[in-house]
C-alpha cells in the first residue's frame, strides 16, 4: 500500500468513533482530508463540524457539512486529526500544515482526541521532524534567540502566514526527552502563540495505518 492509501485507511477507520447527531472536531492536513471525505458519507447523520483551518472548512462546506464556529459549541465528543510524529505516550508533534494553534484549541475542548496516522509517523523520541512554533510576527527574532538557548535551530518558514495572521518558526535539532517540560517552556516565551508539541493534551486513541491493516492504540 502507498502512504496515501494508508492515510485513507485510517481516515475512514475513524468514522467508527463518530456518533450520530453530534458535532465533530476536524483537523487539517492530508490524512485529515481523507477523514473529511469519509465524514461526507455521514453528513445527514451529524449536526456538523468544527474546523481547525480555512482549508478544512472549505472542504467540509464543499461536501455539504455545516461548519460551526467553536464559540457556538459547548462541547465536542471527538476531535480527529493527523500528526507529524507520535510517540508511545501518545504525545505528538503537529503543525507541518501551519494549523497548530487552532488544532490545539479544538483538541483541548474535545472529550476524545483521535490521532490518525500512517506507521511512518510513529517514533520512540519526538524531534526528528522539525518542531513548528507559531509566533507573533514582531517577536520572530526574539523568540528565535530563546529557542536557540533551549538547544534548537530555528528556521523561519518563508512565505507562510497562518490563518491567524502569524508566522512559523521550525525548530531543528531537538531530541525531545521531556515533551511536557519543553511544551511549557516554549509556550512561556513572550511572542509565542503556541508550539506544535501536543504533550499536555496528547491523543486518547491512535489509529495507525500499516500494510497489515489499521492498528488501534488506546491510551
UniProtKB/Swiss-Prot annotation:
Enzyme Commission code: 5.3.1.6
Known catalytic reactions: aldehydo-D-ribose 5-phosphate = D-ribulose 5-phosphate
Keyword Isomerase applies: yes
Active site: 103 (proton acceptor)
Presence of the UniProt keyword Isomerase in the record: yes
Molecular-function GO term, any one: ribose-5-phosphate isomerase activity
GO CC annotations, alphabetized: cytosol
Pathway assigned in UniProt: Carbohydrate degradation; pentose phosphate pathway; D-ribose 5-phosphate from D-ribulose 5-phosphate (non-oxidative stage): step 1/1
Alphabetical UniProt keywords: Isomerase
Segments passing through the bilayer: none
Listed Pfam families: Rib_5-P_isom_A
GO biological process: D-ribose metabolic process; pentose-phosphate shunt, non-oxidative branch
Residue pairs linked by disulfide bridges in the UniProt entry: none
Record-listed substrate binding positions: 28-31, 81-84, 94-97, 121
Subunit structure: Homodimer.
Function: Catalyzes the reversible conversion of ribose-5-phosphate to ribulose 5-phosphate.
PANTHER family given in the database record: RIBOSE-5-PHOSPHATE ISOMERASE
Family, similarity comment: Belongs to the ribose 5-phosphate isomerase family.
Protein name (Swiss-Prot/TrEMBL): Ribose-5-phosphate isomerase A
Originating organism: Salmonella arizonae (strain ATCC BAA-731 / CDC346-86 / RSK2980)
This protein's encoding gene: rpiA
Amino acid at each position: 500500500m502507498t502512504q496515501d492509501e494508508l492515510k485513507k485507511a485510517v481516515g475512514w477507520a475513524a468514522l467508527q468513533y463518530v456518533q450520530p447527531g453530534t458535532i465533530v472536531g476536524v483537523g487539517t492536513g492530508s490524512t485529515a482530508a481523507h477523514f473529511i471525505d469519509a465524514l461526507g458519507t455521514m453528513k445527514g447523520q451529524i449536526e456538523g463540524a468544527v474546523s481547525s483551518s480555512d482549508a478544512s472548512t472549505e472542504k467540509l462546506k464543499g461536501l455539504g457539512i455545516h461548519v460551526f464556529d467553536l464559540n457556538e459549541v459547548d462541547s465536542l465528543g471527538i476531535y480527529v486529526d493527523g500528526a507529524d510524529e507520535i510517540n508511545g505516550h501518545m504525545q505528538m508533534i503537529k503543525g507541518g500544515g501551519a494549523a497548530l494553534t487552532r488544532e490545539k484549541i479544538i483538541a483541548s475542548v474535545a472529550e476524545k482526541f483521535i490521532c490518525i496516522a500512517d506507521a511512518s509517523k510513529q517514533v520512540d523520541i519526538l524531534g526528528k521532524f522539525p518542531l513548528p512554533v507559531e509566533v507573533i510576527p514582531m517577536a520572530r527574532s526574539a523568540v528565535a534567540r530563546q529557542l536557540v538557548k533551549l538547544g534548537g535551530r530555528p528556521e523561519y518558514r518563508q512565505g507562510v502566514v497562518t490563518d491567524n495572521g502569524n508566522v512559523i518558526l521550525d525548530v531543528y535539532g531537538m531530541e525531545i526527552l521531556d515533551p511536557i517540560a519543553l511544551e511549557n517552556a516554549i509556550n512561556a516565551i513572550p511572542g509565542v502563540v503556541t508550539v506544535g508539541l501536543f504533550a499536555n493534551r496528547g491523543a486518547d486513541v491512535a489509529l495507525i495505518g500499516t500494510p497489515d491493516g489499521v492498528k488501534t492504540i488506546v491510551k
